[in-house]
C-alpha cells in the first residue's frame, strides 16, 4: 500500500496545515504571508520597524487590557508561557549541522575526488539560483515558497497518478539529454588532465 502525502509528512499539525485539513490555519498562514509580503515588497515597509512597532502595539494593548481588568473587576488576559525549549534548539542545531555537513561533503567530493559530474550538477543548481535571483528578491522567493508549499502537496494528493506519469516522462528526457552532455563535454574534461599527465611522463 502506497503512503499518502499526508502520511509521509511526519509532523501531524504541519501535514494538516499544508494539506488543507486545517482550513482555518491554512487560510491564516496564506493571508498573513500575503499581507507581510505586500507590506514589505509593495508598500516599502522595513522589517525592523515593523517588528518593533508590532511589539510596541502588543505591549500597549496588553497593558491597557490588564489595567481595565483591574478597574472593571474582569479576569486578567491569559498569556501563554512563551519560551524556546532546549529540545527545539537542539533539533534546529542538528538540522543545520546535517545540512552543513552535506554541503561540505559535496565540496570535498568535487575538490578531492575531482568529480566532474558532481561539479556540473552543482554549477547548474547555483546558476539557476543566481538566474532566478536576478528577477526575484529573497522576500518574494520566501513568499513563493510558502505559497507553493500550500499548493503542491494538495494538488499532488489529488492528481498523483497523472503527475507521476508526467514526472517520469520528464525524468527520462532529462536523463537522455544529460547522457548526451556527459558524452560530449564532461568526458572530454575528464580526459584532458589524463592526457597532460601522459605527455609529461
UniProtKB/Swiss-Prot annotation:
A GO BP annotation = response to bacterium
- Could you name the domain of life of the organism this protein comes from? Eukaryota
Bilayer-crossing regions:
25-45, 46-66, 135-155
Please report a single Pfam family linked to this protein. Answer: Reticulon
| Keyword list, A-Z | Endoplasmic reticulum, Membrane, Transmembrane, Transmembrane helix
Claim: Transmembrane is one of the keywords in the record: yes
User: Is Endoplasmic reticulum among this UniProt entry's keywords?
Assistant: yes
Q: Give the Reticulon domain ranges.
A: 14-201
Q: How does it sit in the membrane?
A: Multi-pass membrane protein
Under the heading InterPro entries, the entry gives:
Reticulon (IPR003388), Reticulon-like (IPR045064)
Record localization: Endoplasmic reticulum membrane
Q: Which GO terms describe its cellular component?
A: endoplasmic reticulum membrane
Q: What is this protein called?
A: Reticulon-like protein B10
What is the organism field in this record?
Answer: Arabidopsis thaliana
**Chain's gene name:** RTNLB10
Amino acid at each position: 500500500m502506497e503512503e499518502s502525502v499526508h502520511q509521509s509528512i511526519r509532523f501531524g499539525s504541519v501535514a494538516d496545515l499544508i494539506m488543507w485539513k486545517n482550513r482555518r490555519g491554512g487560510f491564516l498562514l496564506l493571508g498573513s504571508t500575503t499581507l507581510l509580503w505586500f507590506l514589505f515588497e509593495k508598500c516599502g515597509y522595513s522589517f525592523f520597524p515593523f517588528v518593533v512597532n508590532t511589539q510596541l502595539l502588543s505591549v500597549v494593548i496588553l497593558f491597557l487590557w490588564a489595567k481595565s481588568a483591574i478597574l472593571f473587576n474582569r479576569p486578567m488576559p491569559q498569556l501563554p508561557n512563551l519560551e524556546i525549549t532546549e529540545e527545539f534548539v537542539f533539533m534546529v542545531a542538528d538540522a543545520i549541522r546535517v545540512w552543513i555537513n552535506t554541503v561540505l561533503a559535496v565540496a570535498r567530493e568535487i575538490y578531492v575526488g575531482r568529480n566532474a559530474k558532481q561539479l556540473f550538477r552543482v554549477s547548474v543548481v547555483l546558476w539557476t539560483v543566481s538566474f532566478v535571483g536576478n528577477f526575484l528578491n529573497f522576500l518574494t522567493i520566501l513568499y513563493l515558497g510558502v505559497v507553493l508549499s500550500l499548493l503542491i502537496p494538495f494538488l499532488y494528493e489529488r492528481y498523483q497518478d497523472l503527475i507521476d506519469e508526467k514526472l517520469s516522462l520528464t525524468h527520462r528526457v532529462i536523463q537522455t539529454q544529460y547522457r548526451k552532455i556527459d558524452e560530449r563535454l564532461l568526458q572530454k574534461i575528464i580526459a584532458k588532465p589524463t592526457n597532460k599527465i601522459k605527455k609529461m611522463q
